[in-house]
Design a protein with these regions (language model features):
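Conserved catalytic core of the tyrosine transesterase superfamily
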Residues: 1-176
């Protein structure tokens, strides 16, 4: 494991925190495999890890409350290790590398509570001594919060768009 981490550091492109995460992921994986095989994990043991063993590890992680997203990240670490290990030890790791990551869905952003939005707008009013700047900033925040505009949509409003009608028709990305 240390040789793999040293190799990762040598090729660069990864932060120290990423390397630490990889180390933790692999240590937990190897600990599971040691318990799973009821033996110390050796290079020969790793060469014999099969799809069923990988699925057992993934099921164990999920049963301990690990989210699908976190499991996918850990699986990526383990696959990275096995890619390096298979090349170093000259064996075929296709079965392990073919394990699919669990599906996960991006969470929708949570809306700001009304009280928090009012506080934000009140704070913005106090941040600038120029009335027109405060009015502009409050207007933009109101459009973002109350009308659901994206920042780019609010910033693309032109003077010719004023005064805004009572009903606002927003054409966002791809004129949707």
């Amino acid at each position: 494991m240390d040789a793999w981490l040293t190799w990762l550091k040598s090729i660069g492109g990864r932060s120290e925190k990423t390397i630490i995460s990889y180390r933790n992921d692999l240590q937990k994986f190897l600990s599971f495999m040691s318990n799973h095989f009821q033996d110390n994990v050796s290079p020969e043991t790793l060469k014999n890890v099969a799809l069923i063993d990988m699925r057992a590890w993934m099921a164990f992680e999920r049963s301990n409350g690990l989210s699908a997203r976190s499991l996918a990240r850990k699986l990526s670490s383990v696959k990275g290790f096995f890619t390096w290990f298979a090349e170093k030890e000259k064996f075929e790791a296709t079965e392990i590398l073919a394990v699919r990551s669990p599906k996960f869905y991006n969470k929708l952003p949570r809306p700001l509570e009304k009280a928090a939005a009012v506080d934000l707008i009140s704070t913005v009013k106090l941040q600038n001594e120029l009335n027109w700047v405060s009015a502009r900033d409050c207007s933009i925040l109101t459009l973002l919060y109350c009308c659901g505009l994206r920042i780019s949509e609010a910033l693309n409003l032109k003077q010719s768009d004023a005064p805004l009608p009572e009903i606002l028709r927003v054409l966002g990305k791809n004129n949707k």
